[in-house]
From Swiss-Prot:
Organism classification: Eukaryota, Metazoa, Chordata, Craniata, Vertebrata
Protein name: Leucine-rich repeat-containing protein 3B
Leader sequence residues: 1-33
Domain LRRCT positions: 145-197
Keywords linked to the UniProt accession: Glycoprotein, Leucine-rich repeat, Membrane, Repeat, Signal, Transmembrane, Transmembrane helix
Repeat in keyword set: yes
PANTHER family: IG(IMMUNOGLOBULIN) AND LRR(LEUCINE RICH REPEAT) DOMAINS, LEUCINE RICH REPEAT CONTAINING 53
TM region(s), chain numbering: 205-225
Primary subcellular site in the record, as a coarse category: membrane
Membrane topology, as annotated: Single-pass membrane protein
PROSITE patterns assigned to the protein according to its UniProt record, in alphabetical order: LRR
Domain LRRNT residues, every copy: 34-64
One cellular component term from this protein's GO annotations in UniProt: membrane
Family label: Belongs to the LRRC3 family.
Amino acid sequence: MNLVDLWLTRSLSMCLLLQSFVLMILCFHSASMCPKGCLCSSSGGLNVTCSNANLKEIPRDLPPETVLLYLDSNQITSIPNEIFKDLHQLRVLNLSKNGIEFIDEHAFKGVAETLQTLDLSDNRIQSVHKNAFNNLKARARIANNPWHCDCTLQQVLRSMVSNHETAHNVICKTSVLDEHAGRPFLNAANDADLCNLPKKTTDYAMLVTMFGWFTMVISYVVYYVRQNQEDARRHLEYLKSLPSRQKKADEPDDISTVV
């Protein structure tokens, strides 16, 4: 083996050793940044698994290079504003089987355009801010939540790129129209535009108007009856006074007859 071959062999060995060392450092760095109660691995990008970890809130010390994040089967109740804003490489986010009730307006700011899969199924979500899913390009799963079907939900689903697939399994637990309760959202939306419904205030205005007219009619009837009673009383008194006046007028004739 000549010197050139020996040098190349040693150089290659050093490169492989250096590469292994760098990978070890990266793995150690990722492990050291792994949130408490979670498991982190570097298979195909940094995977952070926090499933069944009894978490009551989303960890705030998530590694910025996280690609897959599993937070399912915990006790998380809300998704705060900008909680994922530093996770620019995040592709998969699983928040299913929690107790999520509230999603803030800017909860997915920073990851809305890069996220590919979002799982919010099996939670307690009834409604969200109309801008909560703005620019979200992910395939979202939001089934098995007690959704209240109204104009806001209609706007939310329309703002999502994959809205038809997302809305397909949404069932209205309650609705602005009682007849839609228990029905799929798509059926309810096809039957009526939930953002163009007659306002109930119109019915109240009509009721107030009718009550006003009814009060006026009753008042007029009462006044009319009382007025007639008063006129009848006066007329009766007048009639009662007539005989006495007639008698006084006849008295001189009786006297002259006697004379």
